[in-house]
Amino acid sequence: MQTLAQHLTSQAVNDSLSQLILTLADTSKAISHAVRHGALAGVLGATEQENVQGETQKKLDIITNDMLKDALKADGTVRGLASEEEDHVVEVSTNGQYLVCFDPLDGSSNIDINSLVGTIFSILPASAGELTETSFLQSGRNQLAAGYVLYGPSTMLALTTGQGVQLFTLHPETNEFLLTNAAMSISADTQEFAINMSNQRFWEAPMQTYIADLLLGKIGPREKSFNMRWIAAMVGDVHRVLSRGGIFTYPTDNKDPKKPYKLRLMYEANPMAFLVEQAGGKASTGYETILDIQPTHIHQRVAVILGSANEVDACLSYHGLDYSEEPGLD
């Protein structure tokens, strides 16, 4: 089996980008270690602090954020970083070539119940000149690499550098990420969907109708039965989609009119959309392809519909859109 470093060499990824990806992977090993120690290390539970999103921070949110910041500052290739847990972008090095956006611990509300969590990251090119928030406001099409690390029964890294999606598994003895799936592929059709049904009454009418038709199964207009899955961590739900197909959505809702969207564009939706498209799927807000969005601020939120291409098309048809001719992967 190829190691991560060997794989990057085989794909002719340039040295500086390879170094950065390896730094993120090595840091994820340390995060995996911290997550596995859990209550034994006293890292469970919440703090009294809130992040810029107004969300109460878990202890591990802060710990993992600091681990990634320290590693990226020492790497030498990073110009600046943006994190879910940072109010503003952070300047790292005036000589860095890359910008890194990340969610250090996606699904951290699952920590106290020992369920799935993960790290999501996106790598963008850095431009010359002063580093500001505007430096980061690039469409998802500009991503040079993206991926996530899933901390589950085994620790797995899903990665794309624009050459498909590869899956690596952390070997528990050698502590090396080894290539275990060289070409992840999302089936075009599916009978699984993932959505937070508790928000149903707050969704827009097109999404309410779409889900109602799925629940009708064989007796409804879709003429087939669907199963629902929900992990309450985007990283876990998207991993399932990449592994066996499906559709994952966190749609627009009016539960809080000031916050109609849940997921963050720069460090959740964009990297996941890049992975999904590279695996043959599609990713949309319901009205716009995620990777084509021009960001307006670093913590911008968007609606997300992603997964099996034909099912995403079916969902979009309820929104009055026809994306059937738009390829998910060139």
Curated annotation (Swiss-Prot):
Question: What EC number is given for this enzyme?
Answer: 3.1.3.11
Binding, Mg(2+) 1:
84, 103, 105
Checking Gene3D superfamilies in the record gives: 3.40.190.80, Fructose-1,6-Bisphosphatase, subunit A, domain 1
Q: Which residues bind Mg(2+) 2?
A: 103, 106, 268
Gene Ontology terms: biological process: fructose 1,6-bisphosphate metabolic process; fructose 6-phosphate metabolic process; fructose metabolic process; gluconeogenesis; sucrose biosynthetic process
Instruction: Kindly list the GO molecular function terms attached to this UniProt entry.
Output: fructose 1,6-bisphosphate 1-phosphatase activity; magnesium ion binding
Q: Where, by residue number, does substrate bind?
A: 106-109, 196, 262
Q: Which cofactor does it need?
A: Mg(2+)
The entry's keywords: Carbohydrate metabolism, Cytoplasm, Hydrolase, Magnesium, Metal-binding
What is the reaction catalyzed? Answer: beta-D-fructose 1,6-bisphosphate + H2O = beta-D-fructose 6-phosphate + phosphate
Question: Where this protein primarily resides, as one coarse class?
Answer: cytoplasm
The protein, known as: Fructose-1,6-bisphosphatase class 1
